[in-house]
């Protein structure tokens, strides 16, 4: 049995190294795409940025805009950097998802508490190095 993906959560990508550029970039997303900014984004001291809300989805997929240049302060290494461009998926059960990744021989790493006290994010790469994130919600 494979992962039980419930939907796309977000796509995260870097927007440069200067936090003072965030308002102008946010304005671009608001004005060009008519998208709202998620006001519930927590302050992440090591990753300034914004979450752009996308419409018409139960999970409400987002663009995560992250300020970073080179390896981010939140990273454990260049490879294990949560600010790398990635696709985040919502899964039904994160424990089962990790078991499945282990069963199929996929190495992963976990960030706990990065975006909230009880948050767990599982990251792994596809064979070509594209980064994926798994989270369980509700």
Feature names for model-found ranges:
Residues 1-9, 40, 98-138:
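Vicinal oxygen chelate
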Residues 14, 53, 88-92:
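Short hydrophobic/aromatic beta-strand micro-patches
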Residues 18-19, 91-95:
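Helix N-cap motif at beta-to-alpha junctions
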Residues 20-37, 104:
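Amphipathic alpha-helical segments
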Residues 23, 95-100:
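Short amphipathic alpha-helices within nucleic acid-binding modules
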Residues 36-78, 124, 131-136:
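Conserved short beta-strand elements that form part of the metal-binding/catalytic scaffold
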Residues 46, 83, 118:
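Exposed loop/turn and edge beta-strand positions of beta-sandwich/beta-sheet ligand-binding modules
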